[in-house]
């Protein structure tokens, strides 16, 4: 027995609206990722021991911009880390507290942890923020692009080295 309330045209309209909304949500999500660096020529760097001793940009990063990136949820730092950010109510507890980072690690060690943490620990859940090769399950829009730019890496390093106990 056919359903008397069934109207195919209404169903198609709902499907179209749902599809449009999904597209808008996806577009909004992509726009909300300011940390996603634009396609750029990746700067070369040398790893010495457990560090990248030299700046990726050749200049020191900006401490204020680095702090802003760390506490910004879309850059993902405070989703896993906690730290001296009293204005942030919800901080992560999956990774080390960032307080005292500048006492525990050198500038070069912090830089390598941001660029490619998996080089130090293959089982890490921390993303490689500046590595683009050898990664698995990378979305088509992100292939060949670092999560953070070299400048953003240097800004975050500049901030983290100020966190001393």
Where are these regions (language model features)?
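N-terminal secretory signal peptides that target proteins for export/translocation
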Residues: 1-17
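Boundary at the C-terminal end of the N-terminal hydrophobic targeting segment
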Residues: 37-39
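Electrostatic cytochrome c docking/interface patches
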Residues: 41-72
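Gly/Gly-Pro-rich "capping" loops immediately C-terminal to redox-active cysteine motifs
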Residues: 78, 82-116, 125-139
């Amino acid at each position: 027995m056919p359903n008397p309330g069934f109207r195919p045209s209404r169903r198609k309209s709902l499907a179209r609206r749902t599809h449009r909304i999904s597209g808008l949500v996806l577009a909004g999500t992509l726009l909300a990722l300011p940390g996603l660096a634009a396609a750029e020529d990746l700067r070369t760097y040398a790893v010495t021991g457990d560090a990248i001793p030299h700046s990726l940009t050749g200049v020191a990063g900006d401490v204020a911009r680095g702090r802003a990136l760390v506490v910004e949820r879309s850059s993902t730092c405070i989703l896993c880390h906690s730290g001296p950010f009293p204005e942030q109510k919800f901080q992560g507890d999956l990774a080390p507290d960032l307080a005292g980072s500048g006492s525990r690690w050198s500038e070069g060690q912090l830089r390598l942890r941001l660029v490619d943490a998996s080089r130090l620990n293959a089982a890490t859940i921390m993303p490689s923020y500046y590595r683009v090769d050898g990664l698995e399950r990378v979305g088509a829009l992100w292939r060949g692009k670092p999560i953070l730019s070299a400048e953003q890496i240097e800004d975050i390093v500049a901030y983290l080295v100020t966190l001393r106990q």
